[in-house]
Amino acid sequence: MAHVRHFRTLLSGFYFWEAALLLSLVATKETNSARSRSAPMSPSDFLDKLMGRTSGYDARIRPNFKGPPVNVTCNIFINSFGSIAETTMDYRVNIFLRQKWNDPRLAYSEYPDDSLDLDPSMLDSIWKPDLFFANEKGANFHEVTTDNKLLRIFKNGNVLYSIRLTLTLSCPMDLKNFPMDVQTCIMQLESFGYTMNDLIFEWQDEAPVQVAEGLTLPQFLLKEEKDLRYCTKHYNTGKFTCIEVRFHLERQMGYYLIQMYIPSLLIVILSWVSFWINMDAAPARVALGITTVLTMTTQSSGSRASLPKVSYVKAIDIWMAVCLLFVFSALLEYAAVNFVSRQHKELLRFRRKRKNKTEAFALEKFYRFSDTDDEVRESRLSFTAYGMGPCLQAKDGVVPKGPNHAVQVMPKSADEMRKVFIDRAKKIDTISRACFPLAFLIFNIFYWVIYKILRHEDIHHQQD
C-alpha cells in the first residue's frame, strides 16, 4: 500500500509540472503573438518577402506576362540645354528621365507606409523597361556623390524610376536661312527589345516635359510650345513603341550682327570713299580698293569656319557674296575712271602717229614722180589730198583745188581733249556716288524682307 501511495504522489506531481509547463508555453506564445501584432515587420524582412529569393519574384519576366502590354508613363525634366553645334549637327542636354508603370507582383499591404524609397542597388532586383534614345550619339550617367537614381514602390504596385542623364542627341539642321533660322531638334524614346504586344510608352498627361526655371541658351531662344508625338517604329523584328518631343529653337541674331553683318556693311561703305578721292591719287584709291577686297574675303571665310560644308546656299553666303561684289565693283570703277581719264593721251598719240605716216607717204610719192614730165605730174598728182597743197604750187602760182579740198573742222587742242575726257571720268565718279549706295539699299530691302519676314513666316507655318 505504501508503494501505491508513493506512486500516486509522484504521478500527481508529474501532472502538476506538466500542466505548469503547458501553461507557460501558452503564455509565451500569446506574448509573442501580442508582440508581433504590436511591432510591424522590419524593412529588411519585408523586402526579402516582397522581392527576395523566397518571394518568387523574377526580374527577368515582365509584369502581366502573356497578358496585356505594360503601359509606361514617361516624364522629362530638363536641367540644362545647350552646346548646339552646327558642324556636327547635334545638341547636348541634361535631364531627369522619369518612368512609371504598374507591377502587380510588388503590391503590398503588410507594411504601413504608402510608398517605399529604395536604394538604387535594388534596381537589379526588379523588372525595368528597356528604354533607349533612338537619336542618341553619346550619353553619361551621374555618380557624384552617389548614383543619381531614384526607385520608389507604392502600395498598389506602381513603380517610379527616375534617373539623371547627360545626352548628346543628333539634330539634323536646315541652314538655308542661317543665321535667321529656326531649328527643330527631337528626342526619341523607344523600346529596344519589347514589341508593342509587351510594352507601350506614353507621355504623362500633366506636364510631360518640364524645363528648369530661368533656363537660357547662348544663341537660341527655346520656345515654350513643345510637340509631343508618337513615332512607332516598324522593323523586321516587329513593331516597337516610340514617343518623341520636338524642341523649337529660334536663333538670336545679336552675335552675328556684331561679328558679321555690321563689319561687312562698314567695309562696303568704306569702299565708297574712293569715289570722293581725286582720280589722280592712284596709289590711295588702289590701296583702298585692294584692302577692302582682301578684308571682305577674310570676313567671308571667317563666316564659314563654324558651319558645315553644305551643298546649298545659306543666307549669310548671299550677304557676304553681294558685299564682296560691291567692294570689288568699287575697285573696278576706279579702273574705268583711270582708263577714261587717260584716253586723251592715247588719242593724241594716235593722231601724231597717223600724221607722221601720212606725211611720209606723201613725200615718198613726190620723190618717186619728180623725174617725169611736169604736165603729167600736175595732172596726176594732187598734194592737197595729203595735206601738202600749201607747200606745192602750180606753175602759175595758184594752189590747185581738188574735190577733197573742202572746209575742214579744226581738231581740238590737247588741253581741250584732256578736259573732255577728265570730265567724263569725273562724271563716272559722280554717278557712282549715288548708284552704289542706292543699289546696296535696294539689296538690303529685298534681303531682309525675304529672310526676316517671308521665310520666317513660312517656317512657322510648316511647324504648325
From Swiss-Prot:
GO terms for molecular function: extracellularly glycine-gated chloride channel activity; glycine binding; glycine-gated chloride ion channel activity; metal ion binding; transmembrane signaling receptor activity. Glycans are attached at residue 71. InterPro entries: GABAA/Glycine_rcpt, Glycine_rcpt_A, Glycine_rcpt_A3, Neur_chan_lig-bd, Neur_chan_lig-bd_sf, Neur_channel, Neuro-gated_channel_TM_sf, Neuro_actylchol_rec. The modification Phosphoserine is found at residues 370, 379. GO terms for cellular component: dendrite; glycine-gated chloride channel complex; glycinergic synapse; perikaryon; plasma membrane; postsynaptic specialization membrane; presynaptic membrane. Keywords: Cell membrane, Cell projection, Chloride, Chloride channel, Disulfide bond, Glycoprotein, Ion channel, Ion transport, Ligand-gated ion channel, Membrane, Metal-binding, Phosphoprotein, Postsynaptic cell membrane, Receptor, Signal, Synapse, Transmembrane, Transmembrane helix, Transport, Zinc. Residues 34-255, 304-314, 452-464 are extracellular. Residues 1-33 form the signal peptide. It comes from the Eukaryota. The chain crosses the membrane at residues 256-277, 283-303, 315-335, 431-451. Low levels of Zn(2+) ions (1 uM) increase glycine sensitivity and decrease the glycine concentration required for half-maximal channel activity. Channel activity is strongly enhanced by ethanol. Inhibited by picrotoxin. Inhibited by prostaglandin E2, probably via PKA-mediated phosphorylation at Ser-379. It is a multi-pass membrane protein. Changing residue 218 to L: Strongly enhances glycine sensitivity so that the channel starts to be activated at 0.001 mM glycine. Changing residue 379 to G: Loss of a predicted PKA phosphorylation site. Abolishes the conformation change observed after treatment with forskolin. It catalyses: chloride(in) = chloride(out). The record marks 294 as: Important for obstruction of the ion pore in the closed conformation. PROSITE patterns: NEUROTR_ION_CHANNEL. Zn(2+) binds at residues 225, 227, 248. Residues 278-282, 336-430 are cytoplasmic. It holds the Pfam family Neur_chan_memb. Belongs to the ligand-gated ion channel (TC 1.A.9) family. Glycine receptor (TC 1.A.9.3) subfamily. GLRA3 sub-subfamily. Glycine receptors are ligand-gated chloride channels. Channel opening is triggered by extracellular glycine. Channel characteristics depend on the subunit composition; heteropentameric channels display faster channel closure. Plays an important role in the down-regulation of neuronal excitability. Contributes to the generation of inhibitory postsynaptic currents. Contributes to increased pain perception in response to increased prostaglandin E2 levels. Plays a role in cellular responses to ethanol. Homopentamer (in vitro). Heteropentamer composed of GLRA3 and GLRB. Both homopentamers and heteropentamers form functional ion channels, but their characteristics are subtly different. This is Glycine receptor subunit alpha-3. It comes from Rattus norvegicus (Rat).
